[in-house]
């Protein structure tokens, strides 16, 4: 299952921005896999924090093989130590066990989150241990398939903006300008900026100052 978008979103973004239009035309359609349901998506995102995609996939596969169906009951039954034995840190195992317990006891309502607006859903997900704003926003995009997720906390989105628009840095004010420009299809814009940040268009380079340049500039002030 992939994040779905089509001619409506592409036409809107192409008309809004000439440089993004060039990126879209060069890269073509992007297929990004999404999560089927919210409970497993939260766990999947906690596992993936600060590790490689390959390591995340390995731990997730072990979890599926060990628990079978991944739901609140099976995760609660597994417990923190067994979760940690799958290759994740003890802290992540604690976060996942705590989340499963809240869902099992009815203290966290997954269905309610699915029907909230973006801001409310991010706020509610961020109440969970181990889930910050950025992770909550990624869950909105890759599980709830919300169309207008454009995260200031996403370093790859910022890198993509620097590369496409030749900025040396992206401050909040500048970021908000692009957020407004791409809305209500910020999620699709994010897909293309991630692709650029990952090297999809080799001649686009990151204009962020190197540390040595930044220190030199600071000494001159």
PLM regions and their residue ranges:
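Short alpha-helical scaffolding segments that buttress acidic/His motifs in well-ordered protein cores
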Residues: 42-47, 96-100, 139-140, 189-193
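Short acidic alpha-helix initiation/capping motifs at coil-to-helix transition points
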Residues: 1-3, 36-39, 73-76, 114-117, ...
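A positional/architectural concept
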Residues: 8, 15-68
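A general alpha-helix detector
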Residues: 41-46, 78-82, 120-124, 156-160, ...
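Alpha-helical ds-nucleic-acid-binding substructure associated with the helix-hairpin-helix region
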Residues: 19-23, 51-52, 56-129, 181-183
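Alpha-helix N-cap and coil->helix boundary residues
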Residues: 34, 54, 58, 70, ...
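C-terminal accessory module of base-excision DNA glycosylases/AP lyases that mediates lesion recognition
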Residues: 1-30, 133-221
